[in-house]
A protein has these predicted regions:
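Short, positively charged, Gly/Tyr-enriched micro-motifs
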Residues: 55-148
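Short, conserved DNA-binding cores of transcription-related domains
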Residues: 1-81, 87
């Protein structure tokens, strides 16, 4: 099971996996010891604070999988900028991995969003009809931008 999550990022370290009745909770963190300040380019190892981010991933055995990632906030001593480390397998504000979003979009492109929601929920993917519509709109918008 651990190899499944190594595909997300080679820097992802699994701390423990909790198996609930309806979901897997994967506690993890990034193994990078330092970060590069996006403002000044300085190499930073000073951690300002941490928080846990809950991100849904592809289901395993029809159970929902949640990654509980300890995300660090770095403090640049050179320019006094505080920022959060980025996760390469999800966007900044998303609660789902990129590969899960791809699966949702591929599933919903040929059927209605209501049918898609029902089908995905049966597979262990927690998603609402309105979210499916939002993902489809974002995908269409991105395709239009790349065509220009």
């Amino acid at each position: 099971m651990r190899s499944t999550f190594k595909q997300l990022s080679p820097n992802l370290m699994i701390d423990k996996i909790d198996d609930n009745d309806d979901a897997f909770y994967v506690h993890c963190h990034l193994k990078n010891k330092f970060s590069i300040c996006p403002k000044c380019g300085n190499k930073i190892s000073s951690i300002h604070s941490m928080h846990t981010r809950k991100i849904q991933d592809l289901p395993i055995q029809c159970k929902t999988v949640f990654l509980l990632v300890n995300v660090r906030h770095f403090n640049c001593r050179k320019c006094k900028y505080i920022y959060t480390e980025e996760l390469e397998f999800t966007s900044k504000t998303s609660h789902k991995t990129k590969r899960l979003l791809d699966l949702i979009l591929n599933n919903s492109c040929s059927i209605s969003s209501i049918t898609s929601q029902y089908s995905l929920n049966k597979q262990g993917i927690m998603v609402k009809k309105s979210a499916i519509c939002t993902y489809q709109k974002k995908k269409i918008f991105q395709q239009l931008i790349f065509q220009i």
